[in-house]
Amino acid sequence: MCATPVSPTPLPATAPLALRWRGTEPYEASFEAMRAFTDGRTAETPDEIWLVEHPPVFTLGQAGDPAHLLAADSGIPLVKVDRGGQITYHGPGQVVAYLLLDLRRRKLMVRELVTRIEQAVIDTLAAYNLAGERKAGAPGIYVAPGPAAGSHAGAKIAALGLKIRNGCSYHGVSLNVNMDLRPFLAINPCGYAGLETVDMATLGVTAGWNDVARTFAACLTANLDGSPAAVAQPQAGALTA
């Protein structure tokens, strides 16, 4: 947890973010790791962004309704977690960013954090000539009407869910890059029946996971603290093609 500092010199609010590339990792491993990271925090612990890609998995938020899983025999595991929100899907071709932040140190309210995360998604999409927009009361980012949207205006392209514990955040945001979208048909995405889910590839973007992940990381960092991330070099094989 975010404990009382041992030393009288905690990190300043402007301490740089550290970026961790975790590669392809089972969801449960990421979930356990971010909880452990948050539980072990002190006032001196630097904030981090983790970028990861998961094998197929459905996750259900702490107040989620299992009835939103429409096909229990899909063969895809369901993991109940402690974030906000309903049910969503993670799978190959999706960039997931986990945001491990000390909100008190950053003097951030939860609503402002959500707004900054959403803006980072919008900025990332704009880098590939796509337009994203918010919807009131429905966290996440949706495809805005326009030439690039085609028939997919209003479709959800990024999902967001957070947990705040002792003033620190974990969980985060997922951006659909180039996925098999069929598993989304087995759920009511984020609890909305009939909501279309789309990815960047469907909208004509040819960039791969690595390229989009780097752009997304830069946009998240810029929106969170306005400075470049302290980037940990990925290990061999840590980034997917």
Curated annotation (Swiss-Prot):
InterPro entries found in the cross-reference section: aa-tRNA-synth_II/BPL/LPL, BPL_LPL_catalytic, Octanoyltransferase, Octanoyltransferase_CS
Superkingdom of the source species? Bacteria
Q: Identify the keywords attached in UniProt to this record, alphabetized.
A: Acyltransferase, Cytoplasm, Transferase
Q: Which Pfam families does the UniProt entry name for this protein? A: LplA-B_cat
Domain named BPL/LPL catalytic: residues: 43-228
Q: Which GO terms describe its biological process?
A: protein modification process
What are this entry's molecular-function GO terms?
A: lipoyl(octanoyl) transferase activity
Annotated site, Lowers pKa of active site Cys, chain positions: 156
> Where does the record place the catalytic residues?
190 (acyl-thioester intermediate)
The EC number(s) attached to this protein equal: 2.3.1.181
Q: What is its main location?
A: cytoplasm
Q: What GO CC terms are in its UniProt record? A: cytoplasm
Q: Where does substrate bind?
A: 83-90, 159-161, 172-174
Q: In which pathway does it act?
A: Protein modification; protein lipoylation via endogenous pathway; protein N(6)-(lipoyl)lysine from octanoyl-[acyl-carrier-protein]: step 1/2
Tell me if Repeat is a UniProt keyword of this record: no
Cross-referenced PROSITE patterns, in alphabetical order? BPL_LPL_CATALYTIC, LIPB
From the Swiss-Prot or TrEMBL record, state where the protein is found. Cytoplasm
Q: Which reaction does it catalyse?
A: octanoyl-[ACP] + L-lysyl-[protein] = N(6)-octanoyl-L-lysyl-[protein] + holo-[ACP] + H(+)
The text of the family note is: Belongs to the LipB family.
Q: What else is known?
A: In the reaction, the free carboxyl group of octanoic acid is attached via an amide linkage to the epsilon-amino group of a specific lysine residue of lipoyl domains of lipoate-dependent enzymes.
Record's function text: Catalyzes the transfer of endogenously produced octanoic acid from octanoyl-acyl-carrier-protein onto the lipoyl domains of lipoate-dependent enzymes. Lipoyl-ACP can also act as a substrate although octanoyl-ACP is likely to be the physiological substrate.
This chain's protein is named Octanoyltransferase
